[in-house]
């Protein structure tokens, strides 16, 4: 698994009405890509945005990164939306979960 951590701050004059359909399309596109696992958006109280995207392999992540619509959305974001952003690509070192039914479960 590969996880992308996308941290961002919007410009004061960000084109928010134009951003909503672009964001919706990026979710639709990412979730239809081979190897897609999940896509989650969060916003902190200080207005920093955080998006987590998971793919099952670096190859599938690369296909997402290079998809023409995603490349165009990145350009739109740099020109019209973001004051700044930072992308971190992660490979999990350890993974485990907890549920009331199963308790703690170690994953790969």
Question: Can you say where each PLM-predicted feature lies in the sequence?
Answer:
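Short S/T/G/P-rich N-terminal loop/turn motif that feeds into the first structured element of a domain
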Residues: 1-48, 58-66, 82-108
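Conserved hydrophobic/aromatic residues on the N-lobe beta-strands of protein kinase domains
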Residues: 51-52
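Short arginine-rich
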Residues: 74-77, 83-84
